[in-house]
Amino acid sequence: MSSSVDFVTEQGRCGDDGNGAGETVKNGEIDHLLSEPSAPTISLPTESFLRAATLLKNQVVEATWKGGVEALASGSGPVLDPTVYTGLLGTAFTCLKSYEVTRNHQDLLTCAEIIDTCANVARATTRHVTFLCGRGGVCTLGAIVANYRGDQSKRDFFLGLFLELAEERELPAGPEEGGFGMSYDLLYGRAGFLWAALFLNRYLGQGTVPDHLLSPIVAAILAGGRVGAADHEACPLLYRFHGTRFWGAANGLAGILYVLLHFPLSEEDVKDVQGTLRYMMSNRFPNSGNYPCSEGNPRDKLVQWAHGATGMAITLAKASQVFPKERDFREAAIEAGEVVWKSGLVKKVGLADGVAGNAYAFLSLYRLTGDVVYEERAKAFASYLCRDAIELVNMTSQETEHDYSLFRGLAGPVCLWFDLVSPVDSKFPGYEI
């Protein structure tokens, strides 16, 4: 029996601490998968992940799109959230992931319908330009899905909208131009817009969003980081989000650096990016090896993508690929993965702060190293979710409108299960390019 099997068996089901024990919420179809002969081995076969993903994807669509839109139309539901992160556009992303694995054209049709609805809402309600939490997500997914469907007119329409976003004056404005109105982070700021551009170029071809639009934004992010670190001798780049110097992937250094690593960097830029990563590596918590949530924060509690070792593991894995001669990045990525293995089986399910996001750290390390132990660990976490995802949501949820969302709910495990059909091709949704 592999170490991944031993670990999950020892952890047991959520609720063993008395917090919700005996209150299991049954899901007949998905629970049926666990009655297979392979279930006692904990790590389920690929076919089971695919079936579980398809079943739960259908539930996500029913809850957020079919039933959800009806509730909105009747006035009985919440205001439509048109974002990838917690909103309806996350369902579109999930359907796109399903289509790419199964080639079910109904998924592509559903995705296109959702995007059209979100486009109408986002135009009036969303001021941000990022992929995860802004209009960049609508434009990007709209162009990609239209391209898959062979709809050149709609593809060009959404691409045109994205290029209009690129003209936002604050995007390339550095500190010397007074560019402090827009943040630098992945969720709401400049890095989040650049991520959307990288995603578009991946699907539609390099140069779809041209370098002359992106390079000034990269320069503005680097300049802002240097100004932010002007009073800090040890760290070359620092950024504030609502006054706090976050380190994590969502609003902090890990996410910003991950995006910067995809662009051509000058010798000075490389020195500052590497120096910032090494500053973070040298200031890990000495006992656990975990990373602080923010500069100077002494609390060692969170192991997740948004804050802590998970996001850093993925960013360091990328740094190792970009700088293969710098062996310390590879070693630090592996060490961060060990933190996730020891402490990452948490009581939430989503990509941002739950087990699904933590499993992606192992998939990133699997692609980096080729070591099957990381594939086994990802499957162990994913198998735990097959058993307990819906129960975990019911135990921990205080925001029912996010229960099926991509980053805080059940759509996250769906994407993870689909990615386990071909782990070598896996990508953390909205983070890895």
From Swiss-Prot:
Protein name per Swiss-Prot or TrEMBL: LanC-like protein GCL1
Gene disruption phenotype: No visible phenotype under normal growth conditions.
Record-stated family: Belongs to the LanC-like protein family.
Annotated GO CC locations: extrinsic component of membrane
Pfam families, per the entry: LANC_like
Task performed by this protein: May play a role in signaling. May be not involved in abscisic acid (ABA) signaling.
Alphabetized InterPro entries for the sequence: 6hp_glycosidase-like_sf, LANC-like, LanC-like_prot_euk
Region (Disordered): 1-22
An individual GO BP term: carbohydrate metabolic process
